[in-house]
Swiss-Prot record:
Expressed in bone marrow, spleen, and thymus. Not detected in heart, liver or lung. InterPro entries: C-type_lectin-like, C-type_lectin-like/link_sf, C-type_lectin_CS, CTDL_fold, EMBP_CTLD, Eosinophil_major_basic, Snaclec. Residues 1-17 form the signal peptide. This is Proteoglycan 3. Residues 27-100 are annotated as: Disordered.
Length: 222
C-alpha cells in the first residue's frame, strides 16, 4: 500500500519539475520576443520622426523658393539710398528731359532720365541727384502727360514710383509715401503680372508689373 503511494509522489514531483523547467526555457524566448518588438517600435518611431522632419525641411525649401522673388525685388530697398553709390555720376543733362506737372505748381517738377537703371538704382538717383523720388501718379491727366513725353523721345516703357510690398497682405505703395488713389492698369494687370515694381507703357499709357531688376528709363519727381 505504501509503495504505490510513494511512486505517485515521485511521479508528481517529476511532472512539476518538468513544467518548471519548460516554463524557465520558454520565458527567455518570450522576453527576447518582447525585446525585439520594443526595438522594432523604437526604430519605426525614429523613421517616422525622420520622415516628418524631411517633409518639413522640403516644405521650408519650397516656401523659401516661392519668396525668393520678393527678397530679390525688395532687399536693396532696405538700404539707405543716400549712403549707396555716392561716387556714381548723376545723369548727364543731354540724357534727361525736364518738365512741369500741373501748370503754375512750383513744386511739381519732373525729370525723365533716359539712362536705363534698375528700380532701386533709379530711386537712388532720384534721391541723390534731385532730392526727390520716382514719380507717383494720381490722375489720368498726369499719366497722359508722362505717356506723351516718353513717346516723343522714343521711350516705350519707363519706371514710375509704384512697388508691391508686404507678405500676406500685399499692397501697392508709392516711393514718395503719397496715397495710392489712382491706377491705370493694362488688361489682366496687376493680378496676372510678375514682378513687384510698376512700369508705364507709352503705347496706351497703361501700367504693368515688372521685375525690379529690369533696366529701364525712369521719371523722378522733385
Amino acid at each position: 500500500m505504501k509503495q504505490p503511494l510513494i511512486l505517485s509522489f515521485l511521479l508528481l514531483g517529476m511532472v512539476s519539475a518538468f513544467h518548471l523547467e519548460t516554463a524557465h526555457l520558454e520565458n527567455p524566448k518570450r522576453e527576447e520576443s518582447l525585446k525585439q518588438e520594443a526595438d522594432g517600435s523604437r526604430e519605426q518611431g525614429r523613421e517616422l520622426a525622420l520622415t516628418q522632419e524631411t517633409k518639413q525641411t522640403e516644405g521650408e525649401e519650397v516656401e523659401g523658393s516661392q519668396h525668393q522673388d520678393i527678397f530679390e525685388d525688395e532687399e536693396a530697398m532696405e538700404s539707405d539710398p543716400d549712403a549707396l553709390n555716392k561716387d556714381s555720376a548723376c545723369p548727364k543733362e543731354e540724357d534727361t528731359t525736364h518738365f512741369q506737372g500741373t501748370p503754375g505748381c512750383k513744386s511739381c517738377n519732373y525729370v525723365l532720365v533716359r539712362t536705363p537703371e534698375t528700380f532701386d538704382k533709379a530711386q537712388r538717383v532720384c534721391r541723390r541727384c534731385y532730392r526727390g523720388n520716382l514719380a507717383s501718379v494720381h490722375s489720368y491727366s498726369f499719366n497722359y502727360q508722362i505717356q506723351n513725353l516718353a513717346r516723343k523721345i522714343n521711350q516705350s516703357i519707363v519706371w514710375i514710383g509704384g512697388i508691391l510690398r508686404g507678405w500676406f497682405w500685399k499692397k501697392f505703395c508709392w516711393m514718395d509715401g503719397s496715397c495710392w488713389d489712382f491706377g491705370y492698369w493694362a488688361p489682366g494687370q496687376p493680378g496676372s503680372g510678375g514682378g513687384h515694381c510698376v512700369t508705364l507703357c507709352t503705347k496706351g499709357g497703361h501700367w504693368r508689373r515688372a521685375s525690379c531688376k529690369s533696366h529701364l528709363p525712369f521719371i523722378c519727381s522733385f
